[in-house]
């Protein structure tokens, strides 16, 4: 008499449970970089948790065959440098779209893709379809990712900063330049203008006061004294004449010592 044993087969999770699990995982990984099995990586879109964001379609062969998909991020094969746009289908299968090779079936669920599969099946299951946008237009690559937008913002900030530096440099250089102010508006701090002779203060009888007269006399006498000093031979002239009177054979040391 033989014995037979059997194990209960693991049932696939229902679609509602799979949808809930996928939503929780995407909400937790939104905007993050996750390592994939095999050394590759995936970058989850920052707005992936919002409903109705970044959706598109895949057109399969046949009349009016469109599959609704949702964009969730980008996957990078670091060894080969290949890049895939990741999409989730209505039954939460993971697809990767590469420019030139088309659509790849990567995993049956997001859990399998992140934990087991990664990009290992990128060349095994290739689906013949055309990627379309939410307006049913052909998908044009490359699409700007979050890192591309951050790089663009950083470049704009650098340009603004450079222009600000140039503006500050022009302002600093302009401070060393004279301002273009007309001469009529400039007030000099020199000697005040002299009054005409008709407005000068005079003493009695229209004559200048005695103090001004004495100042004039002192000025005239000082000028005469300076003239006499200029006309008289100075000490330097006398020394020069003495040097000239010396014999031509005498050295410079004999003159000064």
UniProtKB/Swiss-Prot annotation:
Chain intervals for the UniProt region annotation (Disordered): 163-257
Listed Pfam families: DUF1314
Membrane spanning residue stretches: none
InterPro entries tied to this protein: DUF1314 (IPR010741)
Extent of Polar residues compositional bias: 163-176
UniProt biased composition (Basic and acidic residues): 214-240
Listed name of the protein: Gene 3 protein
Organism name: Equine herpesvirus 1 (strain Ab4p)
